[in-house]
Structures are given as structure tokens and as C-alpha cells.
């Protein structure tokens, strides 16, 4: 799995394992029953199927009480960026990883929501700190 290019799914699967190894509670959002089984096997505490769940934000809030501390968007889609901020608790952070073809996508939080909930939106480029990543993955038994 440690190739020069990882697919969106593989990146998400690694993220679930890293987050779990770091003691975080993971809610995975994807589509399909096969993904549910895999995400839970990799360490996700909860799995939400976006093709079946009518109100994802309400479900995330129900599970977390106030919303997620952080949302990492791996999907390269408008919908993922539009819905991500709605999953966050006050002071939460959205991390942009998936890079859509469209260059004009803006995370879907109105400025008032950004200000009142004190949300942060940050970008992340994967592929840096490779040695540290591999070292941590081996130590935490993420990659077996």
C-alpha cells in the first residue's frame, strides 16, 4: 500500500488507522455496505453511508453530541466540501486533502457559520515527511 500514488479510498483507510492508533474516535463516511465492513475493521467506531443516511450532519451530531472536532475531506467532490463544515463542533477544523477537478470549490460554510462557530479550514498536501509517516505506521502497527 505504500506506493507513490494512493487512491482516495486507500488514503482514507490509512487515515482511519492512524486516527485510531492515536486514540481518536473515528466516524467514517462513505458509500456501500462493503465499505462499512472495511472501515469498521480498520478501526472506525461508526460508519455512515451517505447513500442511505438522509441527514449526515444530524447523525454526526447525534454520535458526538456537539459535532466532530475535525473533518478530513478525502473525496474530491463538491458535495464533500459542501457538507463537511456542517459536521463540525464549535472550534472544529476541516482539513482539505481531496483535490477536485474544479478549482472554485469553497467549503460550504457561510461566513456567519465560520465566524460564530469559530471554524478553521486548512489544507494539507500528502506525501511529505515520508520517513516519519512510515516510521509511525510501523510503530503503531498501522501497516502490517
Residue ranges of predicted features:
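Mid-domain Rossmann-like dinucleotide-binding core that forms the NAD(H)/NADP(H) cofactor-binding site
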Residues: 1-53
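Aromatic/hydrophobic pocket-lining residues that form π-stacking "cages" and hydrophobic walls in ligand
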Residues: 11, 15, 35, 60, ...
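Glycine-rich phosphate-binding loop and adjacent beta-alpha segment
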Residues: 22, 33, 77-144
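Local beta-strand N-terminus motif with an aromatic residue
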Residues: 44, 65-69
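Short amphipathic alpha-helix with an adjacent loop that forms part of the alpha/beta core around
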Residues: 53-65
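N-terminal Rossmann-like NAD(P) cofactor-binding module of classical short-chain dehydrogenase/reductase
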Residues: 69-72, 95
